[in-house]
Amino acid sequence: MSRGRADTAGDCSKNGRRSRILHYLMAIYLLNGLPGGEYARFIKIARLLDVSPSTVSIMTRRLQMKGLVELIPNMGVRLTEQGLKILSNYLWKSAILEVLLARAGVDIDNCRGMGLRMAEGLSDEDAWILYKVLGEPKYCPHKKPIIPPDEINAENARQIALCCGISILQIPNNRLQPPS
């Protein structure tokens, strides 16, 4: 893949819908639902997102139709390579924005949430420009590795959440509760 404009938005053009998609992809990721890995159970996703299991069922079927998840009845759901690509692109943008904000003097504790909120509105093209202007940073302000989205695969995917110290509670526009 070239480092130009990646087609990661897919059918996620509306902000609200895209935000919901990112919430589900993040929840599945946090429950170890990586490509070729474990399956995240609907009930655990429902608890994490504070929605009903039937809502999870409906949304994951939609994600499956978009090619973002693999869904196995009575097993659960896990990300496809395409779903991982969309999620990793979002988290990479967030990390780049964290670096920019930290260099601009924003308190490191505020960078994380601000970066996540701003990442949804940042185009792929603009993110690559920022990445280059910032000197292709290797670490976020929290000293976690930044992995460009074109270098993410199922083997190193576990590191992307660490890039921003991500927690499901920091995804913008959420109604999420801490996992129990």
UniProtKB/Swiss-Prot annotation:
Task: Say if the entry is tagged with keyword Signal.
Answer: no
Residues covered by the HTH dtxR-type domain: 17-80
Q: Where are the transmembrane segments?
A: none
Q: Which SUPFAM superfamilies does the protein's record reference?
A: Iron-dependent repressor protein, dimerization domain, Winged helix' DNA-binding domain
Matches recorded under InterPro entries: DtxR_MntR_Metal-Reg, Fe_dep_repressor, Fe_dep_repressor_sf, HTH_DTXR, Iron_dep_repressor, WH-like_DNA-bd_sf, WH_DNA-bd_sf
What keywords does the record list, in alphabetical order? DNA-binding, Transcription, Transcription regulation
Keyword DNA-binding among record annotations: yes
Signal peptide extent: none
Named from the GO MF annotations, one term is:
protein dimerization activity
Family in the record: Belongs to the DtxR/MntR family.
State the protein's name: Uncharacterized HTH-type transcriptional regulator APE_0142
Organism for this UniProt entry: Aeropyrum pernix (strain ATCC 700893 / DSM 11879 / JCM 9820 / NBRC 100138 / K1)
